[in-house]
Amino acid sequence: MPVVFNDIMVTYVEHLKNILNHILDSYQILNEIEDKPGDLSKIEKEMLKINGFIRVVSNKIDTDKIPTSDFQTLKIKFSRYLENYSFEKEIKTMASLYSDDVSRVKNMRLKILEALKNKHMMDDARELTVNL
């Protein structure tokens, strides 16, 4: 079933692939941040993008409309990530106290990346984009 975005018709699979690519792009940006003073806002921005797109995939994308069984597994991993990890409060606390502390900023970024890598979630997302 096609989905219409800004007068452009895309298939449901293309829509999912586009969302997964947004997640992977933000994940790559998180990987490449150099942990300088002030980077906490960049980390927060990318983390919020990732969480938003993961929430869309978990809540809005129907598994019956995606032809590959790998999607169901990834959707479960996304749901578990949303249930088990939340960095918003820590980032808000850090922003006012430690936003220029490079080691704390780096540690926060690494914890977010570790959570995203858990159970090979990002690898599975990357593989699914190739297979769709």
Region spans (language model):
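Long, low-complexity or tandemly repetitive, helically biased scaffold regions used
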Residues: P2-L132
